[in-house]
Amino acid sequence: PMFHCNGWCYPWTLAMLHARVICIRNIRAKEIFDLITEHKVTHFGGAPIILNMLVSAPKEEQKPLKHKVYVLTAAAPPPSIIFKKMKNLGFEVMHVYGLTETYGHILQCAWNKEWDDLNEDEKADISARQGVRYPNLEDVDVMDSETMKVVPRDGKTIGEIMIRGNVV
């Protein structure tokens, strides 16, 4: 979607790369599969609800992909089952995090080679996490908003995402 933070970044990058951009007015699974096949789409962005629509579409609407399609998804992390089902359809999904106030995505769950040996459920769970910062961001951490101390990286302690850089 080319609105809020995406509208400020992607169109310019895509134009710079001479990429073909396909915009659709009505979001329907059949149309998405048809366009991916017809135009050999390699990358697309969609919210978790779009990914859910694709994996839940009737089998006759789901076209087998002859090539890998890389997907960026943002908003709330998709359930791990969505990552597994998308992979089974031929999509490689990366969850990213960003804000309108940061000119787009600033964190990505970049795959780590040491995760290759995990089982499919563990891989899907890890894929929903946030990971490393994009190079355009100076610093990011999760902190206690009252003490301004970094919280433990234990997957349990709640904190606020603190962002610093010239894109904020």
Located regions from the model:
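A generic secondary-structure micro-motif detector
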Residues: 1, 22, 71-73
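Conserved AMP-binding/adenylate-forming
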Residues: 19, 37, 69-71, 78-96, ...
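Helix N-cap/beta->alpha junction signal
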Residues: 25, 47-48, 75, 165
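Short, Asp-centered acidic motifs that coordinate Mg2+ and/or phosphate
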Residues: 42-43, 70
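Conserved AMP-binding/adenylation subdomain of ANL enzymes
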Residues: 3-42, 57, 139
